Every structure is written in structure tokens, then in C-alpha cells.
Amino acid sequence: MDINLFDFHLPEELIAQVPLEDRETSRLMVLDRETGDIEHKHFTDILSYLHEGDCLVLNETKVMPARLHGVKEDTGAHIEVLLLKQEEGDKWETLVKPAKRVKEGTVISFGEGKLKATCTGTADQGGRQLEFSYDGIFYEILDELGEMPLPPYIKETLEDRDRYQTVYAKEIGSAAAPTAGLHFTEELLEKLKQKGVQLAFITLHVGLGTFRPVSADTIEEHHMHAEYYHMSEETAALLNRVKENGGRIITVGTTSTRTLETIATDHDGKLCAASGWTDIFMYPGYEFKAIDGLITNFHLPKSTLIMLVSAFANRDNVLHAYNEAVKEKYRFFSFGDAMFVASHAKMRNK
């Protein structure tokens, strides 16, 4: 399948550069995955689309301030490091710039020596394995010295780093935020709970591959980056109870979707406690096994994320919805507006 089938025209001014002042004031497009019908709402209207017995699945990963600026100890040359994945102990898979200056044995110093890293291995596209040394607690030092790794399409400086975290972020380890969750406030989540909507939490640590474009000409040639996920026994039991009682499982974001669909695929359609690495790639033709609805942002043209949404809601429906979003001047990407995709006609008949 040609990746150009997932292209659409997006004016640059619709790429949201900063978050809205209030999280829940973003707009919400409601898309019926079966009919393609569209409604234009605000995010707080999600309350009227979710019912007692439904369950929202939220990714409680926390974004690391994963971008570090340091200098080579021997020459003083500036080096930028982006942490991608913790491998073992203090060893990390990273991206460095300029990569040609960092060879095996190179030592990089950050914060006037408060944190140091030695290159222990190299990979393609600027990939380097670094082993860190420090006194104290690594994540406290990282919090002091690091910057939030905003996506490349965001050019503005983020004034408040908490705005690139969900209000329920807990498990540190992501190089990017699960952005569909950025729309929720603690007050909105409380209102949903009061209505009888269950909240379930999983963890998937978002990797930098989220921003990497599909370089292959066809979908089938593309290989997804692997990301670590975890679902507890408590969450699995809750989701199974929801299913048994006729409720719907609504994932907040593509990361929650990938987690549930990975587990269901690996366990004959069942949801159970599991941890591991997933490189699942969902595109039209994929049959969903776990979810009934999806809350997600508006994604990049030709991205694996728009392919996932197209697998769930039909490519023609999704591209029509995206063209409507452009026409109605919705805000796109990480700090943009949201879409709620489900079989809404069936839902209204409940």
C-alpha cells in the first residue's frame, strides 16, 4: 500500500506551536468510524459521549527532560544528546549531534562535570550508546540539566514544561508525551468518574521513532520502532470486567491503543497483565481486538499514526475528517485539538 494514500494538505499555520492556556478548552471532532459522520464540539463535551460502564485507558508515562547540552572533555566542542532508551544500569541508547565528533571512548561533560557520559558504542543515524557517571540520583540531575525534547515541528520555546506532561503522568521514561492525554484536567477526570466512567492506566514509554517519517515507499516495507509497555494485573482485571458488563474500552491516544492491541494479539484476543517491547504496526486491513473507541490528536501526513487511525475508522472517513479539520482550522499535532472516534450511531441508541 502506497504511503501517499495517507497524504493531505496541511497549511503550516495550523500546526499548534504552544499549548492553549486551559487544557480542556481545545476543540473536539467527533467521528463515527462506520458512517463517517462528523460533529464539531469542544473537548469538555466528551462527557456527553462517554457513559456509565465505559472505561478510558490512559498512558501514565512521564516525559524525561531528555535533551542535554554538553561539551567534549578534550576539546570543549559543544555536543547535544537526546536520551532515547535506558538499556542497562547507566547505559543509554541516545542520539548525538554532531555525531561525527563522538566516537568510542569520547567523554562528554554536562553541567560543569555534574554529569559525564562515555561513548561505548555507535549506531546509524547519529545513534550512540553512552554510559553515564555522576554523584547523586540520575533523574534529579537530569531534571536540573535537561530540556524537554519537543517535536521538530514545534519552533516556539515551552514556557512551562508541565504543559508537555499529562496531569496523571507517573512513570518516567518517555522521549515524547502521549499527547491525546494533554487535554484532560483533574477536574474533567473527576467528572467522568462521577458519571461512572472507569479509568484504567497502562504505561508505554514513547520513543523518538514517533517523530521519524516513513522512509519506505510502501507501508509493508516500513518497520516500526520498538517501545516498552506494561499493563498490571489490576488494569487487566478492570478491562475484562468492563467487557463482560457490556461497557466500551476507549483508549486515550495511539500509545494506549498499541499497548492493548499488542497484548490482545499476543494472547489470542485476551487482555492480561503483560510487559515487553512492542513494534506493532496497525494500518488498513488490521483487525482490532481490544478497543471500541479512540481519542487522539490530528497527526502528520503519511505518518504511522494517521495509518493507525485509518485502520480503525476507514481511510476515506479519516481523510475526509482531516480535510474538514483543515477547512475548519483545527489545530494540529502535539499541542493541537482532538478527535474522538467510535461507532457513535450505535452509542446514541444505548
Curated annotation (Swiss-Prot):
Its EC number is 2.4.99.17. One of its GO terms (cellular component) is cytoplasm. The keyword S-adenosyl-L-methionine applies. SUPFAM superfamilies: QueA-like (SSF111337). One of its GO terms (biological process) is queuosine biosynthetic process. Keywords: Cytoplasm, Queuosine biosynthesis, S-adenosyl-L-methionine, Transferase. GO terms for molecular function: S-adenosylmethionine:tRNA ribosyltransferase-isomerase activity. It is found in: Cytoplasm. It comes from the Bacteria. The keyword Transferase applies. It catalyses: 7-aminomethyl-7-carbaguanosine(34) in tRNA + S-adenosyl-L-methionine = epoxyqueuosine(34) in tRNA + adenine + L-methionine + 2 H(+). Pathway: tRNA modification; tRNA-queuosine biosynthesis. Belongs to the QueA family. Monomer. Transfers and isomerizes the ribose moiety from AdoMet to the 7-aminomethyl group of 7-deazaguanine (preQ1-tRNA) to give epoxyqueuosine (oQ-tRNA). This is S-adenosylmethionine:tRNA ribosyltransferase-isomerase. It comes from Bacillus cereus (strain B4264). The lineage of its organism: Bacteria, Bacillati, Bacillota, Bacilli, Bacillales.
